[in-house]
Amino acid sequence: MREPGRPPPIRTDDSNAFANNTMRVRLPAIIDQTIAANDDYPASIKERLSQLRGEIAAGARIHGLPDASSPDASDWAGALRRQREILNAEPTWHNVEWFFAETYAYRCLIDAVRWWESGRDPFLPVKREELNSERLWALLDHATEPTDSAAEALRRLVAFDLWANRIDLSYAASMERGTRIDEDDLLVDERGDLLAYLAKSAGGSRQFYGDGTIYLVADNTGSELALDLALSDCLLRHVMERVVICLKAHPTFVSDATPADVWMILAEMTARGGSAAALAQRLRAYWASERLRFLPQLYWNSSRFLWDLPWSLRNRLNIARLVIIKGDANYRRALGDCLWPAHTPFSQVMDYLDAPVLCLRTLKSDPVVGLPSAETAARLERIDPDWRVNGKRGLIQFKAQTSKSQQVAVAG
């Protein structure tokens, strides 16, 4: 469903080269890698994965889920029906909305490996590879070095949490770049607005928006999740009362974080000792006291855009002190996966959420808003035609509260 005034979502046909290539080449390659990484899968699972791979690459007709008893089956049936209504024809992998196609492809993969029965993460071998990388732990140590002030710690951690996206298991170009950052890679930096808001909300007047909870919509596990947890620790120590980390209910997009990934990385932090173990100890204490929560929901695996939230989740986010949206796929979900003019104000596009919003995103797909001017996008096109999709550039974008009707005053 598209909100009035929004451009139409990107499609998987040849109207968008990157989306079309994703379905023809990138996703089939990921399925091949999944088969290779799980050599002990029974032949029946490998056959189902190979069939799915072939159907996606060839642009075959999209079928409904075979198991109607799964908890999300009716939602996906409705999503497929909507694609059929939009097309007035049978949906194929190469003629539907891209966000639907990608999310549904991973849902079909989960069905093919019988995840609902086994709970076995088909992407675990790849996730463990990054978790065992010394680069991850060096990055975490560097990001959590002592600073002169809470504000400086937050400023540093927000930047590290953004650029940790460059180590993303489904995106080879980002892996090649590692964590090396050029100054002009950060296209928008609104950390100043964020820090001013957080300082005001924690100030002597005690006037602030929301209920004192930050919702962090997580993206990838590994380096990014480690930095999400470090940022949560900093916020809980210096600014906020509670942090809720929103997670995927089942594995998807290769590296997206689930509750199992959180506990796996906490165990690895503890085993590493030193500052990582101390961080894990604090995080476990926050969790025990319910200041830190992990909230998996099938919504985050769905093809729904962010304005199409379940009511219970919408109500929670709308009264949050801050909503942090992480990563490229969540950015696409927030924008409607469509091609706004790149200089469209971020606050205008996100005005459907009442709460203040922070987006941390490295660009790995075409949608982008909030650039300083139309000339910024034109200049980037001249110097780097792949600037929207190659994972090199990033955004730190902040929107203040949209509605003042929920302003909360707490007696000092």
Report each predicted region and the residues it spans.
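Non-catalytic accessory regions outside enzyme or core folds
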Residues: M1-D211, Q397-A411
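C-terminal functional extensions of proteins
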Residues: R2-P4, R11, L247-A249, S255-G412
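Gly/Ser/Thr-rich loops at beta-strand to alpha-helix junctions
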Residues: V96-F100, A218-A226, H250-T252, D328-R333
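Short, flexible loop/turn elements at secondary-structure junctions
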Residues: R107, A218-G222, L298, R361-K364
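Short amphipathic alpha-helices and their capping/turn segments at secondary-structure boundaries
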Residues: L194-Y197, C234, W311-N318
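Residues at the starts of beta-strands that form the adenosine-phosphate
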Residues: T213, E241-V244, P356
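Structural motif
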Residues: T213-Y215, R321-L322
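Histidine-anchored nucleotide/phosphate-binding helix
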Residues: S223-I245
